[in-house]
UniProtKB/Swiss-Prot annotation:
Cited function: Catalyzes the attachment of threonine to tRNA(Thr) in a two-step reaction: L-threonine is first activated by ATP to form Thr-AMP and then transferred to the acceptor end of tRNA(Thr). Also edits incorrectly charged L-seryl-tRNA(Thr).
Ranges of residues in domain TGS: 1-66
Protein known as: Threonine--tRNA ligase
Keywords: Aminoacyl-tRNA synthetase, ATP-binding, Cytoplasm, Ligase, Metal-binding, Nucleotide-binding, Protein biosynthesis, RNA-binding, tRNA-binding, Zinc
UniProt region (Catalytic), positions on chain: 261-567
A single GO molecular function term of this UniProt record: ATP binding
Annotated gene: thrS
Organism field: Mycolicibacterium smegmatis (strain ATCC 700084 / mc(2)155) (Mycobacterium smegmatis)
Keyword Oxidoreductase: no
Length: 684
């Protein structure tokens, strides 16, 4: 969620042999403790972060890392996690330590304790942490002579003992890594005696006083190493920042994010729900949510037809062999629901007369689209062939990661598969990226960057040469767009590299939206061919593309982006008529009929509530246009506009008001209407 500004990268400095990095930082007169941009660590020529106590053997050039950069904040948070662990073991001496990494905007630490932590426990821990920070304990790096020495020291820490031999490369495991096994001791600032310590590869800030602002946010249960077969531990989450101002800003964003939480708004606005009877991650859309979803899909359909896509439909289940051919059962089985074994026939004795077959709920639409391509001979004249489907797919997500609409088990993807020649590939990718960005902008999402996900060396199909060609092609197309491109090493699916569009919402949070995946492998597995101009048979290049990612996820992101106040063209109810008194209801019903004839979604509130209460109710339901009418309005054939920001436009002739509303909706204006913006629009 980080929306707090970061400082620009610092210029490199030189650290003479035998001198600490911290001394070089002071010699360069760079900001020290107490400044928001205090230098907390340095980065060496190999890109490794080093403590300020690091003393190189030769003269080296390093880059100072400030507290108000993402790397600097990560170091502060990691050190704050150590302070938390020290406080826990002081207040709960029987607690055993798990892992405690920095994470986006914060940190956590896992503990094996007898009872879950309470809010009162967190308050006590915060108080103790503040004292540790005030004491200015030193972080001191120490190298173990051997693994046996580490095991001896950590004999009473079973989870740390497991990590001593860890070779998983898990980025969350900050305890081990690199070519040495190290610990960080917290030393008394005056006596230099060891107060506490932890198995850790570092780096860390010089002293605890480099943590100017922190807060513990919550606690929860968590399985050791994220495996439900392991012990259940207690996890404490916290956040730490380079200044109190930055922390306050972050907490304000957290509060605003909670206000915008789509799960909360889904209930308040009657959009969707998650009935227990259906199971985790399986949402149902209510009529109001169905309107928004239909508008999202209908506009997308129209734009896809204009862009030359052909619509297809495929079933929700399939025989096992399809996913053997595609490789999903080999590489993606953990993300699929278990097989359904059906169609077996038995005789009177219960003996199998005809064996059954395994069927699977489809986790992806692509294999079925390949069958459509393969259903008849194809010519180069048909390419690029763009197949598109709003296809329902089902993926087994662990219950712990299912989250509202943004992480579900049953979803609908706006899924396209494009079959091109190699000669068409680059132009098609460029055209496709432009189409994706244009459509996202139409929905009001116009702040984005690109991410390039490359091969996972342990999980891929096809040759290295094909992967390299596909990756470089995507890289060139992405760079040509002029957008920022961020690497995602090892993040690709097993069948090809991808570009993903990372969208920033109104709070500055990044969401992965559209994906464009290049695939030279699947055409081989399905033996897809077309007849080239010279009569030869060739393999097409395959491009996988999902613009929304899934309708459900996109719906959730838009709900939070707009805080539930959808643009008028998407709003479930676009206009509500509010009579000053019951006598004015028939007049507003005439106005409503006029709007309905123009395709506007309109209601008239004829409830027994007073007018003021009705205005509050419909403001809370985030209806973009409220039309009020009393005696003067009805006599003059006019209405008064009321908007969510409490502004009004009084006495607007009804025909003019209808045209203003119809034009606003037809123009697909994404901002919330106000008296000022509607008047400005009417004046054009």
């Amino acid at each position: 969620m980080t929306a707090v500004a970061s400082s620009a990268p610092a210029a490199p400095i030189r650290v003479p042999a035998g001198t600490t990095a911290g001394a070089a930082v002071r010699e360069a007169d760079l900001p020290g403790r107490g400044a928001p941009d205090a230098i907390v660590v340095v980065r060496d020529a190999e890109g490794r972060l080093r403590d300020l106590s690091w003393t190189p053997d030769t003269d080296v050039e390093v880059t100072p890392v400030a507290a108000d950069t993402e790397e600097g904040r990560s170091v502060i948070r990691h050190s704050c996690a150590h302070v938390l662990a020290q406080a826990v073991q002081e207040l709960f001496p029987q607690a055993k330590l798990g892992i405690g990494p920095p994470i986006t905007d914060g940190f956590y630490y896992d503990f094996d304790v007898e009872e879950p932590f309470t809010p009162e426990d967190l308050e006590r821990l915060e108080k103790r942490m503040r004292q540790i920070i005030k004491d200015g304990q030193l972080f001191s790096r120490r190298v173990y002579e051997s693994k046996d020495a580490a095991r001896e020291e950590l004999a009473n820490e079973p989870y740390k003992l497991e990590l001593v031999d860890d070779k998983s490369g898990d980025p969350d495991v900050m305890e081990v890594g690199g070519d040495e096994l190290t610990a960080y001791d917290n030393l008394n600032a005056r006596t230099k005696e060891r107060v506490w310590g932890d198995l850790c590869r570092g780096p860390h800030i010089p002293t605890t006083r480099y943590i100017p602002a922190f807060k513990l946010t919550r606690s929860s249960a968590a399985y050791w190493r994220g495996d439900q077969n392991n012990a259940s531990l207690q996890r404490i989450y916290g956040t730490a920042w380079e200044s109190q101002e930055a922390l306050d800003r972050h907490l304000e964003l957290i509060e605003e994010a909670q206000r915008r939480d789509h799960r909360k708004l889904g209930v308040e606005l009657d959009l969707f729900s998650f009935p227990d009877e259906l199971g985790s991650g399986l949402p149902v859309f209510h009529p109001r949510g169905g309107v928004v979803r239909r508008e999202l899909e209908d506009y997308s359909r129209r734009k896809h037809l204009e862009a030359g896509y052909e619509f297809v439909n495929t079933p929700h289940i399939t025989k096992e062999q399809l996913y053997v051919t595609s490789g999903h059962l080999e590489w993606y089985a953990d993300g699929m629901f278990p097989a359904m074994h059906i169609d077996a026939e038995y005789d009177a004795d219960g003996q199998v007369r005809k064996p059954g077959q395994n069927y699977y709920l489809k986790p992806m639409n692509c294999p079925m689209h390949h069958l459509i391509f393969r259903s008849r001979g194809r010519s180069y004249r048909e390419l690029p062939l763009r197949l598109f489907e709003f296809g329902s797919v089902y993926r087994y997500e662990k219950s712990g990661v299912v989250h509202g609409l943004t992480r579900v088990r049953g979803m609908t993807q706006d899924d396209a598969h494009i079959y091109t020649t190699r000669e068409q590939m680059r132009d098609e990718l460029t055209r496709l990226l432009e189409f994706v960005l244009s459509l996202l902008k139409d929905y009001g999402l116009d702040d984005y960057y690109l991410e390039l996900s490359t091969k996972d060396p342990e999980k891929y199909v096809g040759s290295d040469e094909i992967w390299e060609e596909a990756t470089e092609t995507l890289r060139e197309v992405a760079e040509a767009s002029g957008l920022d491109l961020v690497p995602d090493p090892g993040g690709a699916a097993f069948y090809g590299p991808k570009i993903s569009v990372q969208v920033k919402d109104a709070l500055g949070r990044s969401w992965q939206m559209s994906t464009i995946q290049l695939d030279f492998n699947m055409p081989d597995r399905f033996e897809l061919e077309y007849t080239a101009a010279d009569g030869s048979r060739r393999r097409p290049v395959l491009i996988h593309r999902a613009l929304f990612g899934s309708i459900e996820r996109f719906f959730g992101v838009l709900t939070e982006h707009y805080a539930g106040a959808f643009p008028a063209w998407l709003a479930p109810v676009q206009v509500v008529g509010i009579p000053v008194a019951d006598a004015h209801t028939p007049y507003l019903e005439e106005v409503a009929a006029q709007l309905k004839s123009r395709g506007v979604r309109v209601e008239v509130d004829s409830s027994d509530d007073r007018m003021a209460k009705k205005i509050v109710n419909h403001t809370n339901m985030k209806v973009p246009f409220m039309l009020l009418a009393g005696d003067k309005d009805a006599e003059a054939g006019a209405v008064s506009f009321r908007f969510g920001d409490r502004t009004q436009i009084n006495g607007v002739p009804r025909d003019e008001a209808v045209e203003m509303i119809v034009r606003w909706i037809a123009d697909r204006i994404n901002e919330v209407p106000t008296a000022e913006t509607v008047k400005a629009g009417a004046a054009k």
